[in-house]
UniProtKB/Swiss-Prot annotation:
It comes from the Eukaryota. The modification N6-glutaryllysine is found at K15, K19, K24, K28, K57, K80, K116, K123. The modification N6-succinyllysine is found at K15, K57, K80, K123. The modification N6-acetyllysine is found at K5, K10, K15, K19, K24, K28, K37, K57, K80, K116, K123. The modification Symmetric dimethylarginine is found at R9. One of its GO terms (molecular function) is protein heterodimerization activity. It is found in: Nucleus; Chromosome. The gene is H3-5. It comes from Mus musculus (Mouse). The modification N6,N6-dimethyllysine is found at K5, K10, K28, K37, K80. Gene3D superfamilies: Histone, subunit A. GO terms for biological process: chromatin organization. This is Histone H3.3C.
């Protein structure tokens, strides 16, 4: 986000600062004895942008192998029982699935940007799929 220059404005009056009570002044000036330091937090969006750059650079699979394998076996169970899979077959399915999902999210992001938003919503996914011709 670009920094904007702030111009000085003439004051139009207002309330004069009141004198602080003695107890308030001593409370403010006394150092805190707790010494508990707040954990460092990045500004909203900083970590998200860092993750975007990290995942765009990388080529590794993003979905864990075993949960994906269980999902494939569960879906295949509906069509035929006692199916066996080569590990290369599940690897190929995972590569194709992740490539499809990444492409769908790219198109979904474009739909959100077109609607002047930065947050993707289910309606963006539906629009992206409809434009692709996957769902009428």
């Amino acid at each position: 986000m670009a920094l904007t220059k702030q111009t000085a404005r003439k004051s139009t009056g207002g309330k004069a600062p009141r004198k602080q009570l003695a107890t308030k002044a001593t409370r403010k000036s006394a150092p805190s004895t707790g010494g508990v330091k707040k954990p460092h937090r990045y500004r909203p969006g900083t970590v998200a942008l860092r993750e975007i750059r990290r995942y765009q650079k990388s080529t590794e699979l993003l979905i864990r192998k075993l949960p994906f394998q269980r999902l494939v076996r569960e879906i295949a169970q509906d069509f035929k029982t006692d199916l066996r899979f080569q590990s290369a077959a599940i690897g190929a399915l995972q590569e194709a699935s992740e490539a499809y999902l990444v492409g769908l999210f790219e198109d979904t992001n474009l739909c959100a940007i077109h609607a002047k938003r930065v947050t993707i919503m289910p309606k963006d996914i539906q629009l992206a799929r409809r434009i692709r011709g996957e769902r009428a």
